[in-house]
Each structure stands twice: as structure tokens, then as C-alpha cells.
């Protein structure tokens, strides 16, 4: 699903912004670009945020966090038909881009605000980024997390020196409680995305990408609340006005997509891209996205899983669901990006090891490298040995065997055996089934 192309900063244009190679004049005229550099009037909302704020943030952040690499991917380029460049934000100390905005916000605090301390609500990357840099700057930090936040995330946040308060069954309840505490204690509320300093900090990603790979003409950026794409859009348009910018959301949480389309969203129960599972986009971020972003794509859970596995196998890098969203959109809509110079942000790498293990196994099934085959055979001594010998002849490696008699619907002298096999590809699976059937067994594939 896509949004219609939108104009940039009220400037008129003859063609959509997606024609990134069409030059700057098609995006912004000189007057509009000058406005973009000083302050932004987006729709009916005056946003006290501009390209210069991102530049100031870059100066403030320099030397205080990792300037992550932005590298060309030869293999992903061959797969997608685009020239693909990856920004490894999962290499930050807390494995997420969220550090940028959090640190920029902390550095902008007054002496009085630093002494009072900061508070945020988060179950993940925003919490750890804020807690880590608050500790470095000796700023008291309080983080409110939902009660059912995984213990590992709670402990990691505490290890960074923050006071952690567990409250509520979801993020919205935790956020409401955090705001109450902020008012009661006089703490500085740090919004995870709808804050000028947060947005400007996240925008430094685009500055680094275009400095490292100036040929990039297209950006695909994950969207949760919109802080990263809003900041990157301001930065990228300030440097390269004709650049094409696309957002991507999880299909189960299409909040920004639906807000801009004027339709009521339907949310899923969960998504593996929990880092972008936001039900309400920011007011500031929404205004910026509406004016500066070409389209928003939606990707499903299978798209995200496939991209996580591809990045692990090809780039040898671990990303969370949100970090794989950009590649998922590129793979799903590869015809839209043929021949483009595409920059993707691997925005985070905090994924539960057990979830990653499940995703890898499911990916192997989809690619035909792991198969479950049921074989019907006579329940006689030596029958199982004949099946395994047949499997060995076709180079199938047995991973698991389940021999079931009592719960089978077959006659009493027959049995079903389930084999989980390591295979090469789908063609190899078909070869195995054909070999078993030719040997007199009845074999079928479990889908």
C-alpha cells in the first residue's frame, strides 16, 4: 500500500518526488529551500525545526557516539536490482539509533533541568539510550516500563544507572504514569519521538549517510512515531532537495499511513517489529512526514522475518524487526527501486535470542532448507532403517525423528514417522519425496 506523492514545503512541482534523479528544482524552489533551512511551515503547523537544527545536533553529538558505517552491499544489490547502501545503526553502544535523539536532548538541558533529572516511558531502545547517556552526563534518569517488560530489558536499563518503575500493562499506561510522575517531581519529560531535539538528533543519520555515500538518491526509513524519518527528511532535503524519501511501517501497526490517509487504523495484537509498533504518530513528526516523504509502504510479518534472515546470512549482522523493515520494503517493492541508489537504515539490533532462533528456523523452512516429511511404513523391524538409508542416498540430513503408533489413524500394522530434514532447497525436497515413493514408501510434505 502506498500514499500519493506529496509536495515539499508547499512548493509546486510538475512530477512526484519519487523521480529522485530529476534535480532539485522539482522538489523545492530556492525560496522554499531557504525557508526549509531556517524554519519549517508544514501544512498549518509552524514547526520550530529546520535543517540547521540537524546540523547543530551533528556538531553536539560528534565524538559522543559511534559514527556508524554506511556500506555498499553487493549481494543485496544483485538481489533487488538497486544499488543498496546499509547504515549500521545497530553498531551503536546500545544497538539502536535512539541514542542520537536522547543524547541531543540531554545536551540541550539547562543546568537546572540537569539537576532535576529526566523521565521517559519505554520498553526498549529509547529507555536504554536515554539511561546510558544520562549516566554519562550525570543526569538522574527515571524510566517507566510496562509491568510485563522482559526482565533482560529491565535489568539492562537499571545497569545504565536509571531508576526503573514498572507500571501498567502496556506502553500507553506506562506513559500516562510517567507524565504524572514528571509533573509531581518536576522532572523533564523526554518524549520518544515528538520532540524537536529528538527529531534533530535522529536526523544526523541522514547527514552521515549522504557524506559517506553522496550518490544515494533514495532513502527507505522505518516509521514508528516518526522521529527518525522526520529528522532524516529535514536533513536529506537540506543537502539534496531532489532525494526520494520513503517510509515503511509494519502492516499490523499502520498508524502514520492511516493518519495521512485519513482512515481509521486496525491494529494487530503484536509484531516482531515492536520498535515501530506505535498506535499514535507524533504531531510534529506527522506534519513533517506529510510534506517531505513521498510514500509509505506496509510490510507483513513474513517480509520482516525474511529480511532479518537475509541480513544475518549475507551481511553477518543481527537486526531486530524494525531494523529489517527498510530491506523488507525494498524486497517487496523492488520494481519501484530498479536502478536507484538506495540507502537503508538498520536502526536497531536488540532482538530476543529465542525469537531470533525461531525466525531463523522459519526462514529455513521458507527457503526449502528445512523440511518436515511424513512417511507411512510397515511397522516391522528394519523398516525405519530402510527409510533412513534411502534418505542418506539423496543426501538428506536428519534433524529430528518422531515415531508415532498410538495416535495414528493407520491400520495397526502400519506406522507414521515424521522426519525433520536439513535440505538444500525446494528442488531437493521434491527429490527426497520422489525417492521415498519410488522405494515403496508413502511420503508427503508438511506445509
Predicted features along the sequence, with ranges:
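Cysteine-centered motifs
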Residues: 8, 27-28, 36
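Cationic, low-complexity basic patches in intrinsically disordered or flexible, solvent-exposed regions
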Residues: 13-16, 39
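Composition-driven detection of intrinsically disordered, low-complexity segments
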Residues: 17-20, 24, 43
Amino acid at each position: 500500500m502506498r500514499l500519493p506523492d506529496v509536495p515539499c514545503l508547499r512548493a509546486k512541482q510538475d512530477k512526484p518526488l519519487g523521480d529522485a534523479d530529476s534535480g532539485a528544482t522539482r522538489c523545492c524552489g530556492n525560496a522554499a529551500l531557504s525557508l526549509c533551512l531556517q524554519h519549517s511551515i508544514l501544512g498549518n503547523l509552524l514547526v520550530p525545526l529546520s535543517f540547521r537544527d540537524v546540523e547543530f545536533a551533528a556538531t553536539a553529538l560528534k565524538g559522543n557516539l559511534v559514527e556508524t558505517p554506511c556500506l555498499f552491499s553487493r549481494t543485496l544489490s544483485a538481489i533487488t536490482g538497486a544499488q543498496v547502501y546499509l547504515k549500521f545503526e545497530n553498531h551503536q553502544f546500545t544497538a539502536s539509533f535512539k541514542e542520537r535523539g536522547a543524547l541531543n536532548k540531554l545536551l540541550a538541558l539547562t543546568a537546572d533541568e540537569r539537576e532535576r533529572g529526566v523521565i521517559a516511558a519505554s520498553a526498549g531502545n529509547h529507555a536504554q539510550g536515554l539511561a546510558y547517556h544520562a549516566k554519562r552526563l550525570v543526569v538522574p534518569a527515571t524510566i517507566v516500563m510496562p509491568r510485563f517488560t522482559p526482565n533482560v530489558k529491565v535489568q539492562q536499563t537499571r545497569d545504565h544507572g536509571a531508576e526503573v518503575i514498572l507500571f501498567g500493562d502496556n506502553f500507553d499506561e506506562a506513559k500516562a504514569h510517567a507524565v504524572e510522575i514528571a509533573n509531581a517531581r518536576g522532572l523533564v519529560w523526554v518524549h520518544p519521538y515528538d520532540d524537536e531535539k529528538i527529531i534533530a538528533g535522529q536526523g544526523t543519520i541522514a547527514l552521515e549517510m549522504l557524506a559517506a555515500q553522496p550518490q544515494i538518491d533514495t532513502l527507505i526509513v522505518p516509521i514508528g512515531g516518526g522521529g527518525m524519518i522526520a529528522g532524516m527528511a529535514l536533513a536529506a532535503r537540506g543537502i539534496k532537495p531532489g532525494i526520494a524519501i520513503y517510509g515503511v511501517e509494519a502492516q499490523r501497526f499502520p498508524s502514520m499511513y492511516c493518519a495521512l490517509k485519513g482512515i481509521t487504523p486496525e491494529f494487530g495484537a503484536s509484531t516482531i517489529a515492536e520498535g515501530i509498533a506505535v498506535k499514535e504518530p507524533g504531531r510534529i513528526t506527522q506534519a513533517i512526514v506529510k510534506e517531505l516523504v513521498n510514500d509509505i509502504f506496509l510490510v507483513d510479518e513474513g517480509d520482516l522475518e525474511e529480511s532479518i534472515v537475509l541480513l544475518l546470512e549475507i551481511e553477518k549482522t543481527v537486526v531486530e524487526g524494525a531494523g529489517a523493515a527498510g530491506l523488507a520494503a525494498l524486497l517487496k517493492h523492488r520494481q519501484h527501486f530498479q536502478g536507484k541508489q538506495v540507502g537503508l537504515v538498520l536502526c536497531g539490533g536488540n532482538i530476543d535470542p529465542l525469537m531470533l532462533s525461531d525466525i531463523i528456523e522459519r526462514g529455513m523452512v521458507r527457503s526449502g532448507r528445512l523440511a518436515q516429511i511424513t512417511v507411512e511404513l510397515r511397522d516391522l523391524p528394519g523398516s525405519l532403517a530402510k527409510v533412513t538409508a534411502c534418505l542418506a542416498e539423496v543426501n538428506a540430513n536428519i534433524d529430528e525423528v518422531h515415531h508415532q503408533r498410538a495416535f495414528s489413524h493407520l491400520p495397526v500394522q502400519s506406522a507414521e514417522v515424521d522426519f525433520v530434514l536439513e535440505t538444500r532447497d525446494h528442488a531437493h525436497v521434491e527429490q527426497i519425496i520422489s525417492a521415498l515413493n519410488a522405494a515403496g514408501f508413502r511420503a508427503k510434505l508438511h506445509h
